[in-house]
Amino acid sequence: MDIVEYKSDVWGREVLLGASWDLLWVVIALSFVFIAVHAVIMAVRKREAKPSSDGPKVHRHAAIDRLFHWVMAIAIFVLLITGVLPIIGVEFSWLTIHWIAGLVLTAVVVFHIVRSLFWQDFMSIWVTPKDIKEPFDDSIKPGKYSFAQKSMHAAVTVLTLLVIVSGLVMFALIDTPWWDRTNALSEATLGWIFLAHGLSTLALIGVISLH
């Protein structure tokens, strides 16, 4: 099994083609293993008493945050469907749908970053040294977000930004309603972009499975 794939450019030189999609099956297999192990752990775990519904209700997420979450989720799933299915042999006209979903994802992520910086407590979701002790010390109580939630957010943030940046570079090179296809990047450079896009996509599939 290969991690990366190579090809010969127009001069016969070996250049990167991108990530090997053999890794997709590894990610899928590991995801199923994790889900199965998690299900077993939850089945045998001692269930704690459910908290009372008495008292004031805590408003954890504003409507705009829930809307952002679902628009982002739908965009990512459309990107995965249109990006992965053609790789495994399901042929359909996918490219236009793919880049439209990519632009939607980019727009909602930029909106979320701006809103987080100026209208929310930006640092409340980021992992701090204190948070790392939380899983090992029952006396440490999480705030609004637990260590697991903060870690998941950090992973999704890094991977999503990698997918977006590499995707925008590729988008700038294809035919669109606004510009024609260009060969501005060498095949070697483009191979590194494909590699970054492919590996971050595969990692995002794994993280979504954990989520």
Where are these predicted regions, by residue range?
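Membrane-embedded alpha-helical bundles that constitute the cytochrome b-like, heme-associated redox core
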Residues: 1-210
